[in-house]
Amino acid sequence: MIITIEEEVYNNLKKRAEKEEISIPAIVRKFIVSYFNLEDSTKDYKRKEPGESVIIVNGKKYFRINCKMERQNELYIKSELKKKGISVNKLLKELIIVTV
């Protein structure tokens, strides 16, 4: 699942990833899977250099991340987010604020 997140959210996720010594997509997967109470057997890997692309829109940076997870979970998450009318970025922002 390819997600786009704001720079502020990305930096917070990056700090958490360094602390737990796993990749940023693994941290994103952890947050999303735990939020929806799902089980995902995708392995977590440590990455030294990010493979994300940066997009700049009106002077604001966004990062595009490829977050791998089981296909059935990906479809379920997309449909639930669509029902709620929120994006992954907004969900992660709320989860990060709650856990800080």
UniProtKB/Swiss-Prot annotation:
It comes from Acidianus filamentous virus 2 (isolate Italy/Pozzuoli). This is Uncharacterized protein ORF100b. GO terms for biological process: regulation of DNA-templated transcription. It comes from the Viruses.
